[in-house]
Amino acid sequence: TVIVGFFVFNTDNFYPLNISGETNFEAITVTTALTFFAFLGIESATIPADGIKNPEKTIPKATIIGTTITLMIYILSSIALMGIMHPSEIANSSAPYADATGMILGEYGKNIIAIFAIISGIGCLNGWTLLQIEIPKNLAKNKLLSTIFSDTNSREVPYKGLIISTILVSILLLINYSKDLSNIFTYLILTSTFCTLILYFFISLSEIFILYKKRKPLKKFKSSLITGIPAFIFTVWMIVGVGKESIISGIVLLSFSIPIYFYQKKYAKS
């Protein structure tokens, strides 16, 4: 799509950029919140660190290189897509990249994109499945979840945690079954983004509080303030951008963890 798109590029498609009916700031806020989902879990390479060779070098390298390549692909493919299709066509398309390629290469091109989308989806599913079982397992090891999540089979796979988390995700999908596929996808993206942003919200200020608690000199705060404050402001902006429905859903989901946390805290001590 990127290569072919630039041969039939139409700059008129970029004007007007905002056709949502909202103000530019509101449109940018919502769009950024949706886009931010693609970069959630940028720290995910650290989660399976125990099973990675030479993690001190491999993880930073994989994170930086992988993010850079992904960012370039996203930017170039998005620009090419907008150069091929009018914004209204993109908004009404359930598969814009396939439709854009189909406009140039016909049905054959759409099928190629569909095949690549399936391959990409399977690859993403593998990665998310790994995280889906590793995070609960590590929480269980730290006595923040039941030990059932750290139980493994003969291949060292925490299969019980995988089954439980898969059931929970399936229930969430069934609750929103009345919506069409596009709305379900948007809802899940924004709700997932909100739940992750809560973590980023506290992390963005954590180093400052740690330094303050340890009574470190003011000069030690400089780098923390330079990175922490902008990150905090950006996180708050993104939380606002996900919308009321996703915020409420996220709060409900997160609230389920509160009794579990206190129960595990008491159980761990006993």
Q: What spans do the regions from the language model cover?
A:
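Helix-loop-helix junctions that connect adjacent transmembrane segments
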Residues: 1-114, 246-249
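Transmembrane helix-loop junctions and nearby membrane-interface residues
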Residues: 2-9, 78-85, 173-177, 204-211, ...
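A generic transmembrane alpha-helix motif of multi-pass inner-membrane proteins
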Residues: 3, 195-196, 205, 222-270
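Generic alpha-helical transmembrane segments of integral inner-membrane proteins
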Residues: 3, 68-80, 119, 163, ...
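Membrane-helix boundary/coupling elements in multi-pass transport proteins
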Residues: 39, 44-52, 110-147, 186-196, ...
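Helix-loop-helix connectors at the membrane interface of multi-pass transporters/channels
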Residues: 52-56, 61-69, 125-163, 198-201, ...
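TM-loop-TM module centered on a large, flexible mid-protein loop between adjacent transmembrane helices
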Residues: 64-126, 145-192
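Transmembrane helix-loop boundary segments of multi-pass membrane transporters
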Residues: 95-98, 112, 174-202, 217-222, ...
